[in-house]
Structures are given as structure tokens and as C-alpha cells.
Amino acid sequence: MDKFWWHAAWGLCLVPLSLAQIDLNITCRFAGVFHVEKNGRYSISRTEAADLCKAFNSTLPTMAQMEKALSIGFETCRYGFIEGHVVIPRIHPNSICAANNTGVYILTSNTSQYDTYCFNASAPPEEDCTSVTDLPNAFDGPITITIVNRDGTRYVQKGEYRTNPEDIYPSNPTDDDVSSGSSSERSSTSGGYIFYTFSTVHPIPDEDSPWITDSTDRIPATTLMSTSATATETATKRQETWDWFSWLFLPSESKNHLHTTTQMAGTSSNTISAGWEPNEENEDERDRHLSFSGSGIDDDEDFISSTISTTPRAFDHTKQNQDWTQWNPSHSNPEVLLQTTTRMTDVDRNGTTAYEGNWNPEAHPPLIHHEHHEEEETPHSTSTIQATPSSTTEETATQKEQWFGNRWHEGYRQTPKEDSHSTTGTAAASAHTSHPMQGRTTPSPEDSSWTDFFNPISHPMGRGHQAGRRMDMDSSHSITLQPTANPNTGLVEDLDRTGPLSMTTQQSNSQSFSTSHEGLEEDKDHPTTSTLTSSNRNDVTGGRRDPNHSEGSTTLLEGYTSHYPHTKESRTFIPVTSAKTGSFGVTAVTVGDSNSNVNRSLSGDQDTFHPSGGSHTTHGSESDGHSHGSQEGGANTTSGPIRTPQIPEWLIILASLLALALILAVCIAVNSRRRCGQKKKLVINSGNGAVEDRKPSGLNGEASKSQEMVHLVNKESSETPDQFMTADETRNLQNVDMKIGV
């Protein structure tokens, strides 16, 4: 607390110093027309634009003067005020500048803050890049005004040029978008028209009671991750009043949360930090922020794509109980869907790409919400941003935040549902290509700004600043969730993974898969929520580990279990997280009995879910061998079943070797008996002993001749003695020769 008050005291002392400094980045003059940027991009109101041009002894240019400047080579990728319009001069078509259009592109929305163009009648008729050294018509004031020329030269003077008190002391300041040529509600499509950010009611057929809420909330920050061939870019947003003074005195926790790291799977990634810490491209943005505007013929070098979500967060807990009927007018119509149509333009210095899509203005969860509707579940439709492809890039930005009014365990009253379901479409007069820019929204719970649904036009930036939780999204995937034609048959899920999610989503392995179904009269089932502890974090910040990205950090993972009373079907959507890669999957299990169990194994954990009407929370850990759950509705506590031990492979191999040895021993024993019946001699004669040993002296010649000896000898040759026969056995066989005399 002492640290907080110390920072607060220093901040209060230094805020006047930081606010008393204005940097004006100007470009070369083309037929007297030049571009002026104040501090960050898009931080000049229409009244201030006129005062600023007057301070430069200039005026707001007319359309004819802009066209003349365009004819001699003046083009930018910045929306700026001229007389009666907000325009971008474009010579070369670029998919992310002016929606791939050329000429003086007119933006129909001109009620917010942009840059400005000025016309100096005394300037040369051609290109003039001489340095501007002062504001000739500025009057005395306490503001330090720094003029930054295109070549980087700086000239400082004290004074003031603003005459409107609202410009000097804005009562409703808005953030400037220093990362993009346009913001979501100012984006445009081909043909010179735009879709404003406004609330649209899309009731389900047979529903004729559209509803809308006047409650406002803050817009969460959005990060667009773009890939053209092999590069990855992350768009960021900053505030005008934040400079290095503010950065020095930010709490360390807030600094840690100001990082967004992205990586596209399968590509060589360039990592851009979403905070103010310098790295390859963010530092370049800071330099441009201080040195020059980035207008001119090489404007494409200054821009990285960024979008701002118009999806509000969840209601305040106390206000939600009062205003629930605004979100859900009747318990019998939970199918009413509220969508916000948003057009989005990402500007890089060569052009503008228009996006259009449907964003859900439903409550955006800061991982855990503290409000809930006790009886009804309100499904909301999938939010999409429709990308306008170009000759080199096709960009898709999606964001979806879903929440369901169900009881939250341990007293929390809302379960968030959030996913990034992406459907791509085409904007007018645009062509498809094969190099997509894939967008991913990074919700920041404390970085949001309010959007009034009754106001069709939102400010380009919200009032919040980016000091909330950090959710890093690496790689990308798109999920198409389609409701079935029959409201009682559930959902059709099409999961299309384009790469592994090395999700440093905080890398929170945190991504929920939400459902949108029709025909539910009153769904009393509560969502099933899992909290996963990931012990395997891989940062993708080019070898640097994010300071707030510690191993074992805990994130939230939601799964939703819904029941269909008419068909007695239970469909469970459960995110499955891999401990090694952080990849996600959704398992849809349909069972005939509403009380059946759905088993899920999470990286070694085996959790059993009992969709029996209560809120079942399962806490899993990748390092633990078991998991446990608790059911809010009763005293039952379920634990995962113990996995049956398996026979190890080494034991199987050992048993096989023993069997083989036994067979070999039997074979050897059998072969050792081969000598039986092979070493016998049969001798047939009339005397004793062998014929060779007898002397024929006792026989006369005729008798010896008449006697016939039969000497049968069955023996092996001496060259191949039996190796199994010993010497004793050989002698015994010789003495046991059978002699038969005839």
C-alpha cells in the first residue's frame, strides 16, 4: 500500500509535466498540403485541427487542394481532417490503406479524433521538405510544443494554440490509437461508406420483441496478429497522455501485464511487445511517435495493424441484478441474440483494409466474473470480423466473449464463456488471396472503455489503459460454431486447427469453448469449470522470458454442459489441454441419459463430470496424479477413478527371454541323448572275443575256411568322434561287443 501511495504522489506531481508537452510531427509540403500528427496518432479533434492549422499560418485544405497535392505525389495512410471531411490521400492501392482504394478516400465518420491536414498558401507549388521551426501564430501559454520535422529535426517553443477549452481540458478524453491507421468504428469498405459500431438486435425467428440495453461498459483491448507470408505483427494501443514520465512510475505489476507476445505456427515470427518496453518494432513506433508522423510515400513502414473491440465486459455485480431484464427480457426467450456490427480498418502506410463483421456486445469475462443470473442461460452468437483480402494479405480478426448466467462455485456468480470463433467473409470490391492475416483478440480485463449501445458511433479508443491481465496468444486457430436447424438437436462443431497453440494465453492455457443453442426453454444446468495448472510454459519472445510469465501459473479453462430436455440428450463441450504443447480440443459427448457421466482425461488427470444440475468444479493439475471435484448442490465429493496399472514392457520382455531359455535348455537335453543306439558293434562268430583277437591255431584250414564269420560293426569313423561321448563310455562299448559264432 505504501508503494501504491508513493507512486500516486509522484504521478500527481508529474502528470502536469507530462500533459504540458505536445509533440507535433509534420511532413513535407505538397502543393502546400502537409500532414500533422499530435503526440500519438489520432488525437486531434475537429476544432483543434482548425486551431492547429491556424497556428502554422495555414488552413484546413479543401478537397480540390487535396486532389492537387495528390497529383504531385502526396499520399499517406492516415485519416486526417480537411474542410468538411476526413480523408486519406492514396496513389498506390494498398489493402490496409483506404480499403485498397486510390484517390482522396473519404471516410464518412468524422465525429471522432484523427490527425489533420493543413494547407499553407505560401508554400511552393511542388514538394517542399524544408524544416518548420516554429508556430508563427501560437500565443503565450505553459505548454512545451515540440515541432518534429520529417528529417528528424526538432524545434521547441513555449506557447499554446488551442482555443477550445474542451480541447485543453477534455472532460471525456479518449485513447489515441498509435498503432493503426484507423480504428474499428472508423473503418471503411470499398465504395466510400462504412459500417458504424452500433447495436443490432437479431432475434430468433418467431421472436418479435427485440431488446437492447442502455448499460455501458468498457471496451477490452484487442490485439491483431497479422502474418504476410512469414512475418508476424502484433498491434498495440497506447494513450496520448502516457509518455516516459508515466512509464517510470507505473507499478511493476502493471508493467508486467503490458506485454503481448505472438507467434504464428509454421512461420518465422517477429515478436512485438504490446507494452512500452522497446523491442524491434515497438521501439521503432516510439521513435516515430516522437520524431515524425510517418506520412508520405513510405507510410507503409510505420504501421502495424491494430483493431479495437467494441464488445463490452460484464455488468457490475450490483447493477446486473437490477438490469438483468435488459439483457434477458423474458425467461422464455433465451434465444435472442445481440450482435454489434463493426467495421474495422487496419492502416499500414500504403493503404487501408476495411473489415466488417459482427461482434457480440455481450459481457466480456475477465477470466472470472462475479455476477450471474440464477435461473437462465443466455446464449449469444459467435462474433466474427469479416476480412477484406488483398493482393498480398487477407486479414481476419475475430473476437468472441460469451457468458452464461449460471451459479459460480464458491460464491462467484457468473461463468465466463470465451472463445475465438473465426468465420471469414469478403468485403465489397475485394479479392481473395492465399496469405492470411489472422487476428486474435486479447481481452484485458482492466483495459476497456464504454460503448453506449444507443450511440451508433463509438470513439476510436476507450478511456481505459492497458494495465490489466495479459493474455498472450501464440499461433492461431479458427473454430466455426454453427447452430443446427433443429433447436433440439444441439450443435455442429467444426474445429480447424492451423497450428499448435503454444499458448502463452497468459500462456494461459485458457480458452473456453462456448455453445449457442436454440430451443432451450429454461436451462438449469450449470457450467462445468476446470482450473488447470500448467507447468510447461514456453515463451516466444525471442529468447526473453516475460517477467509475469512464471511457470506453474494458474489459468481458467471452462467447459459447458448443457441438457436438452426434449430429447434427453446431454452434450458436453470440454476443452482438452495438452501439457506439452498447450493445444486445445473440444470433446462433444452425447448420451441418452441425462445423469450419465462424461469422463475426461487432462494430461494425466482423469476427471469425472456429473452433469446432474449442480455446478461441478474440477481442479486439475498436470503435476498431480489425481484430481478431485466438489459439487455445490450437495455434500458429495467425487474423485477421479484410479487408473488400472498396466504390465510394464520390461516385464513382458523378461518373461519372453525366460521362456526362450527354457526351450533352448530342453533342446540341448534332447540332443545330448543322440549317442543311444549309435555306438554298438555286432559280431557273429563261433568263438569268444573278437575275430581280430582270436588265433586260428585251434582250427584246421578247411574248418576255418568253412566257418563264416559275420562281423557287423556299426561305428562312426574315427575322424568324427562324438563330442558328447566320454572316454569311459567308449571303452565300455568296445568291451560289450556282441559276438555270435556260426
UniProtKB/Swiss-Prot annotation:
Biased composition (Low complexity): 179-189, 386-396, 422-435, 502-516
PTM description: Proteolytically cleaved in the extracellular matrix by specific proteinases (possibly MMPs) in several cell lines and tumors.
Compositionally skewed regions (Basic and acidic residues) per UniProt: 407-421, 619-629
Residues spanning the membrane: 650-670
Matches recorded under InterPro entries: C-type_lectin-like/link_sf, CD44_antigen, CD44_antigen-like, CTDL_fold, Link_dom
Domains as described in the record: The lectin-like LINK domain is responsible for hyaluronan binding.
Tissue specificity note: Detected in fibroblasts and urine (at protein level). Detected in placenta (at protein level). Isoform 10 (epithelial isoform) is expressed by cells of epithelium and highly expressed by carcinomas. Expression is repressed in neuroblastoma cells.
Keyword DNA-binding on entry: no
Organism: Homo sapiens
Gene that produces this protein: CD44
Residue(s) carrying Phosphoserine: S672, S686, S697, S706
Protein name: CD44 antigen
Stem: annotated span: 224-649
GO cellular component: apical plasma membrane; basolateral plasma membrane; cell projection; cell surface; cytosol; extracellular exosome; focal adhesion; Golgi apparatus
Region: Disordered, residue numbers: 160-189, 261-285, 372-558, 590-642
Link domain boundaries: 32-120
Subunit structure: Interacts with PKN2. Interacts with TIAM1 and TIAM2. Interacts with HA, as well as other glycosaminoglycans, collagen, laminin, and fibronectin via its N-terminal segment. Interacts with UNC119. Interacts with PDPN (via extracellular domain); this interaction is required for PDPN-mediated directional migration and regulation of lamellipodia extension/stabilization during cell spreading and migration. Interacts with RDX, EZR and MSN. Interacts with EGFR. Interacts with CD74; this complex is essential for the MIF-induced signaling cascade that results in B cell survival.
